[in-house]
Amino acid sequence: MSSSEDEDDKFLYGSDNEEPKNEKKRPREAAEDDNEGPTSDKVVSQHNNDLKRPKLAKDSLANASSDEEESGSESDSDIEFIISTGPDPHRLDSSTVPGSNNAIVTVSEGANVGGETMSKSTATATTAEISTLNALGDTEVAGTSELDNETLGPETTTKSGTSAEGIDLDKEGLYNDEPVSTIDPEVLKEKPWRQPGANISDYFNYGFNEYTWMEYLHRQEKLRQEYNPRRILMGLMTLQQQGRLDQPQGGHQSMPDNMAINNPQPTNNDNMMHKPTPPLPNFPMPPMFGGFSPFMPPGMMAPMNRMPNQNQNQGQNQNQNQNQLSK
């Protein structure tokens, strides 16, 4: 039993007396070379290699200098990239702006552009593409400027034909070559402001609508008919002749001025033509309320009672005088 277990252990785990055979046998020639050491032929070849190394260094330096000379000679034939931004197509005066926004970029052959080495063929292809794009951009801008000029017309351009004029806010709007203030909305066949969903402010400004606008037009027409410059001028001349143009701003004259205007003083001719009126006779006031005048103070009662007696005495005196003269 023990022998079988030992054999199983050797098979599974290996024997303790055996050594691992990891080394490989070297070739016979290599072993012989190690035993013999370096020969004379190897020494000579190594010496020749050492002599050739400085020559190779000199050749590499010569090649580097020749490459620099060639690059210097080829610098005259460097590729130039002309990148034109072109005029702005959104501007009206883009057609007159010269193509001055050009950026010239010189790229030498073998230069590192964008992390890649630029070769001669690649640079040539890139130049051709840029020139094609510039030509297309110039053509598009020219077409856009011509279209703008045709659309705007000569009225909205200045003398140079490049910039548009501003909007005249004082000019009255026209509709079919007629002023809008003379058009009655009822005459129009189409009334888009009556359509559902229409914005009335797109057709009437300042808060007007169809009815208030018609009322405004009728009122303006009435004012034009009533306005008569000649009549206003004649009224001003009349006021100037009467001296009323120098009145105060309030329009109210002082009391003496009003009296002088309403009651002018008569001249000499007026005095001759108009005689003074005779004075009214003094008739006694009739007695009221039992012989007493209303609201009469007591002191005034005695003279009124004496007035008939005085008249009687005067009449008697006159009669006596006449009798004496007759005698």
Curated annotation (Swiss-Prot):
Record GO terms (molecular function): protein-macromolecule adaptor activity; RNA binding
Domain of life: Eukaryota
Gene coding for it: FIP1
Record's compositionally biased regions (Acidic residues): 66-79
Pfam families: Fip1 (PF05182)
InterPro entries: Fip1_dom (IPR007854), Pre-mRNA_3'-end_processing_reg (IPR051187)
Keywords noted in UniProt: mRNA processing, Nucleus
Record-given protein name: Pre-mRNA polyadenylation factor FIP1
GO annotations of cellular component type: mRNA cleavage and polyadenylation specificity factor complex
Family: Belongs to the FIP1 family.
Keyword presence, Nucleus: yes
Job of this protein: Pre-mRNA polyadenylation factor that directly interacts with poly(A) polymerase.
GO biological process: mRNA processing
Organism: Candida glabrata (strain ATCC 2001 / BCRC 20586 / JCM 3761 / NBRC 0622 / NRRL Y-65 / CBS 138) (Yeast)
Residue ranges of the region described as Disordered: 1-102, 136-167, 245-280, 301-327
Ranges of compositional bias, category Basic and acidic residues: 18-30, 49-58
